[in-house]
């Protein structure tokens, strides 16, 4: 079976969804820009030799509808002979895109693929057009479809206090701001043109949503966002609303060698699991455990972790039950996470994987694990190994 390697990985800056830098930029343009950028950064790859494009997107309607993967590929002027498909596993969509492409390569159906994902949450809100089947109420609580309330449930079950959530949220912003200041995101961000507050076209090469001034004290002043009476989860301890895209160029190991391309890492294992929708945020725990089992590794073998921060209230129980609380500042979300950078749904899996690869290289870690929760009760994880 072919080994799957990551040759390159990039992302856009994360733009603020409400009146932010990308308010006049469409999701297809963000996607096409990254497709073009990957190919221009790797000129030995003939676009016509791409076997497929797998692109994650959750809200597949309006500008994100009608197979945005193909629309973006056409905008990027990739040859018409190259197919493209849009993948939807809610929050795990672009990581699922990576898994789908990797399997195609493993079994010999592909040699070179572009994968990635996008979500413009300013143009297509998360709840746009959602219409759950009434019959679901017989099996699933209505609150299970309300992500903030599932986070509240996990906080109660695991004894995660409001103060713990606010401290973790402040850490996310502080670490993301420090990473930006130190230039640690420069290796992964590809500049994109957007518009400033006055509508003037501007080149953006840094994330717009990070709030460096965030403190525990400022977060403690916020009201609960989902349970106004007994809640502990606030807007400040939830992932920010942002717009963005991320992408990777992946190949079989033999194809990369044939083209003289240096592989940054290989996929060691992949896993997807289901869990109770009422605690959907717990999905990273069983997903990570299964991915580690398939890789023949233990949690101690992993040098760096990226765990998507949908909510501090769900991230902390996962960190606790994975046995990482005492390693938090050594191994977990070292450049901050989605609380600071935002969680553009279809983008995030590729985004955290891209950030993980750069952290693995910077810290000379052999193994890294990226994992995320998924709405309605799933988890997804990928173990990467540097080559």
Swiss-Prot record:
Pathway annotation: Lipid metabolism; fatty acid beta-oxidation
Top-level taxon in the UniProt lineage: Bacteria
Single GO MF annotation: acetyl-CoA C-acyltransferase activity
Annotated SUPFAM superfamilies: Thiolase-like
Major localization listed first in the record, in broad terms: cytoplasm
GO cellular component: cytoplasm
NCBIfam families according to UniProt: AcCoA-C-Actrans, fadA, PRK08947.1
Stated family: Belongs to the thiolase-like superfamily. Thiolase family.
Protein name per the record: 3-ketoacyl-CoA thiolase
């Amino acid at each position: 079976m072919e080994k799957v390697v990551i040759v390159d990985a990039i992302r856009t800056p994360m733009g603020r969804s409400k009146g932010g830098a990308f308010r006049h930029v469409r999701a297809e343009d963000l996607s096409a820009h990254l497709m073009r950028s990957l190919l221009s950064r790797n000129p030995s790859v003939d676009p016509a030799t791409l076997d497929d494009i797998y692109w994650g997107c959750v809200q597949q309607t309006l500008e994100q509808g009608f197979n945005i993967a193909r629309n973006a590929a056409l905008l990027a002027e990739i040859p018409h002979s190259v197919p493209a498909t849009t993948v939807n596993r809610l929050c795990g969509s672009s990581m699922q895109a990576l898994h789908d492409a990797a399997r195609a390569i493993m079994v010999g159906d592909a040699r070179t693929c572009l994968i990635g994902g996008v979500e413009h949450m300013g143009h297509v809100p998360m709840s746009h057009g959602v219409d759950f089947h009434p019959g679901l109420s017989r099996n699933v609580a209505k609150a299970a479809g309300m992500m903030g309330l599932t986070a509240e449930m996990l906080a109660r079950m695991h004894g995660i206090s409001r103060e713990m959530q606010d401290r973790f949220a402040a850490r996310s912003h502080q670490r993301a701001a420090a990473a930006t200041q130190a230039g640690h995101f420069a290796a992964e961000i590809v500049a994109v043109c957007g518009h400033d507050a006055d509508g003037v076209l501007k080149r953006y090469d840094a994330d717009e949503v990070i709030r460096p001034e965030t403190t525990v004290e400022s977060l403690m002043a916020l009201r609960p966002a989902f349970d106004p009476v007994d809640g502990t989860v606030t807007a400040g301890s939830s992932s920010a609303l942002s717009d963005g895209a991320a992408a990777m160029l992946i190949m079989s190991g033999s194809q990369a060698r044939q083209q003289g391309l240096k592989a940054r890492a290989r996929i060691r294992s992949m896993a997807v699991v289901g869990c109770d929708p009422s605690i959907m945020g717990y999905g990273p725990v069983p997903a990570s455990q299964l991915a580690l089992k398939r890789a023949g590794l233990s949690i101690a073998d992993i040098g760096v972790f990226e765990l998507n921060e949908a909510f501090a209230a769900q991230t902390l129980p996962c960190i606790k039950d994975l046995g990482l609380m005492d390693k938090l500042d050594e191994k977990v979300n070292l450049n901050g996470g989605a609380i600071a950078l935002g969680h553009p749904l279809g983008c995030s899996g590729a985004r955290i994987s891209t950030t993980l690869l750069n952290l693995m290289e910077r810290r000379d870690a052999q193994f890294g694990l990226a994992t995320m929760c998924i709405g309605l009760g799933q988890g997804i994880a990928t173990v990467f190994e540097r080559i």
